[in-house]
C-alpha cells in the first residue's frame, strides 16, 4: 500500500479520524482544545493521600529508656471544617501505622518536650518495617533541654511503600533525664505525625 503525505487538512472536513503508524516526530503545530474527550493512562495530578495523627495526652517519660508511642493517638476532628485529610487516610493500631495506598511518602514526626531538669539530648525516632515484624530506625533527631522549658524536635524520612500489608511505621522517643514529658493535646497539634504521598512507588 502506498503512503501519501498530507500537508494540510481543513478542520471542518474531518469528522472522525485515526493516526496509525506515525511517530510523534511527524506531528507538529498547535493542537486544538479537546472538549468532551475521554483520556486514559494519564498520571493523576496533585497529592492523593495526606493525613495527620496527633498524640492526645501529655505523658511522663522514663529516664534513659526508649519508648514506643503505642497509645493515645487520634486524627484531628474534621467536623470543624478546618482540618481535612486527603484520600482514605492512615490507619493506626497500637501505634503501628498502615498506609492507605502504595507510593513514596514523606513521613514527619514532630515531638514537643517539656522538662523540669537539665537533660542531655532527648531523642525521637521513626521506625519502619518491610515485613510487618522487624522494625529498623530510618530517621532520628535530638534536642538539648536546659532546665525548665520546652522544645520541639522533628525527624522526617521518605519511605517507599511498595506493599501496604508489610511496610508500616511506628514512632519512639527517648528521655535523657528525669522529669521529662512529651506534650499531647486533643484540640491542637503539639506532638504529632504527618504522612504525605508524593509519588508512585
Tell where the protein language model's regions lie, with residue ranges.
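Terminal (often C-terminal
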Residues: 41-120, 130, 139-141, 182-201
Amino acid at each position: 500500500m502506498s503512503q501519501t503525505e498530507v500537508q494540510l487538512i481543513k478542520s471542518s472536513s474531518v469528522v472522525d479520524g485515526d493516526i496509525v503508524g506515525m511517530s510523534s516526530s511527524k506531528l507538529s503545530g498547535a493542537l486544538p482544545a479537546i472538549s468532551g474527550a475521554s483520556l486514559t493512562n494519564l498520571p493523576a495530578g496533585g497529592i492523593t493521600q495526606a493525613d495527620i495523627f496527633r498524640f492526645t495526652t501529655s505523658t511522663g517519660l522514663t529516664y534513659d529508656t526508649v519508648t514506643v508511642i503505642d497509645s493515645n493517638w487520634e486524627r484531628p476532628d474534621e467536623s470543624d471544617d478546618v482540618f481535612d485529610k486527603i484520600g482514605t487516610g492512615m490507619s493506626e493500631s497500637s501505634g503501628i501505622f498502615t498506609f492507605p495506598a502504595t507510593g513514596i511518602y514523606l513521613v514527619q514526626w514532630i515531638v514537643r518536650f517539656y522538662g523540669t531538669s537539665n537533660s542531655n539530648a532527648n531523642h525521637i525516632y521513626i521506625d519502619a518495617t518491610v515485613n510487618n515484624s522487624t522494625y529498623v530506625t530510618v530517621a532520628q533527631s535530638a534536642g538539648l533541654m536546659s532546665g525548665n522549658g520546652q522544645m520541639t524536635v522533628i525527624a522526617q524520612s521518605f519511605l517507599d511503600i511498595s506493599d501496604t500489608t508489610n511496610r508500616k511505621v511506628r514512632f519512639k522517643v527517648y528521655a535523657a533525664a528525669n522529669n521529662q514529658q512529651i506534650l499531647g493535646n486533643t484540640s491542637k497539634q503539639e506532638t504529632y505525625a504527618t504522612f504525605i504521598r508524593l509519588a508512585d512507588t
